[in-house]
From Swiss-Prot:
Record-linked Gene3D superfamilies: P-loop containing nucleotide triphosphate hydrolases
Main location: cytoplasm
EC number: 2.7.4.25
Organism from which the protein derives: Haloarcula marismortui (strain ATCC 43049 / DSM 3752 / JCM 8966 / VKM B-1809)
CDD domains xrefs: CMPK
Protein name as annotated: Cytidylate kinase
Subcellular localization, as worded in the UniProt entry: Cytoplasm
GO CC term, one of those recorded: cytoplasm
Matches recorded under InterPro entries: Cyt_kin_arch, Cytidylate_kinase_dom, P-loop_NTPase
GO MF term list: ATP binding; CMP kinase activity; dCMP kinase activity
GO biological process: pyrimidine nucleotide metabolic process
Reactions accelerated catalytically: CMP + ATP = CDP + ADP; dCMP + ATP = dCDP + ADP
One Pfam match: Cytidylate_kin2
Length: 192
């Protein structure tokens, strides 16, 4: 089974994806880790690399191509990135969307990255706006369109174990025999 975990920065994607992969004994691949490594290799912060990606679309396209290739080639995998559900498309068996209010996400990022809350909030908002515009420009994706996801979870409502419990129940309850049709991922320009 290929499970995708998507959502905005600070929504808990990495926390859930790692826990879910461990619970299911699946492999875990993180687009965020790949992106942060790219930023570090270039001597940039993720926000700076996001800004550079506004001018150089190949940065996003290389990452997204890699995610789509991984989705096409692997099974028993939790694939995590902002666009994992979109990039995995028809290859995904279950697409999860995580979210939380901006202040909650900014607080998580401030704690994780040891920076002031207001700075984290501003950067998180700017990063989200930058990414949403690029996703629209490159692939005609509306990042706010959640219709492709099988389950959406507000991670501010539960602690990480609770989020895992909710999503693990959904995954373990899934049966291809009872599946009347997953939400299609249509009209995406997979032009890498």
């Amino acid at each position: 089974m290929l499970i995708t975990v998507s959502g905005p920065a600070g929504s808990g994607k990495s926390t859930l994806a790692k826990s879910l992969a461990d619970a299911l004994n699946y492999e875990h691949v993180s687009g965020g880790d790949i992106f942060r490594s790219l930023a570090e290799e270039r001597g940039m912060t993720p926000l700076e690399l996001n800004k550079a990606a506004e001018e150089d679309d190949q940065i996003d396209r290389d990452l997204d191509r890699k995610l789509r290739d991984i989705a096409a080639e692997r099974d028993d995998l939790v694939l995590e990135s902002r666009l994992a559900g979109w990039m995995a498309g028809e290859y995904a068996d279950m697409k999860l969307w995580l979210t939380a209010p901006l202040d909650v996400r900014a607080d998580r990022i401030a704690t994780r990255e040891n920076k002031p809350f207001e700075q984290a909030k501003t950067e998180t908002r700017e990063r989200g706006d930058s990414e949403a515009q690029r996703y629209s420009d490159y692939y005609d994706i509306d990042f706010d369109d959640l219709s492709i996801y099988d389950l959406s979870v507000n991670t501010a409502r539960w602690d990480p174990q609770g989020v895992l419990s909710v999503t693990l129940h959904a995954v373990e309850s899934y049966s291809p025999d009872g599946d009347e049709g997953k939400a299609p991922v249509e009209n995406i320009r997979y032009e890498f």
